[in-house]
């Protein structure tokens, strides 16, 4: 995992990714691309048409926009076309912006964000949890489960990073 990938020099990181992958073709570098738009995230993925003629050579980027949509979608109960699971449908129909949607790292939470089960109320909603994990494990991309998510650990980013990383 390459932390804060877009903050580093583009040309250096592109060359670094290419050289590592040339030497170790089965090694995968995941770039933390914490951006709130699929278009912005897709710019950083290897072979992105949005970055042409440049190429980041970064095969796997983190799908932060999907994380946000999942956290909202499984909290909203609506029968209209503006929220709930429609959020996921709408977002996934835009996968054409990615060079390779199957190489996106997908996740419900991580060490920098509030946990999916932010508080005890959300942790007790097992239907919400099961639906979200099922979606995560069956949608396109490479699923990642942050330690503690599987046992419904709680943690709110507003209480500090220590609350997200407790043992």
Go through each PLM region and give its residues.
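Conserved interdomain hinge at the start of the Helicase C-terminal
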Residues: 129-131
């Amino acid at each position: 995992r390459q932390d804060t990938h877009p903050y580093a020099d583009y040309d250096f990181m592109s060359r670094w990714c290419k050289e590592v992958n040339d030497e170790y073709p089965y090694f995968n570098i995941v770039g933390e691309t914490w951006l709130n738009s699929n278009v912005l995230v897709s710019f950083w993925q290897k072979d992105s048409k949005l970055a042409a003629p440049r190429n980041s050579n970064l095969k796997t980027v983190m799908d932060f926009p999907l994380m946000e949509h999942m956290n909202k979608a499984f909290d909203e109960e609506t029968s209209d076309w503006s929220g709930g699971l429609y959020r996921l449908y709408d977002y996934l129909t835009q996968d054409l912006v990615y060079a390779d949607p199957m190489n996106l790292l997908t996740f419900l939470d991580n060490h920098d964000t509030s946990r999916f089960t932010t508080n005890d109320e959300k942790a007790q909603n097992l239907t919400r949890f099961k639906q979200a994990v099922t979606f995560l494990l069956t949608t396109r991309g490479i699923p990642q489960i942050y330690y503690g998510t599987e046992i419904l650990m709680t943690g709110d980013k507003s209480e500090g990073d220590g609350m997200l990383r407790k043992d």
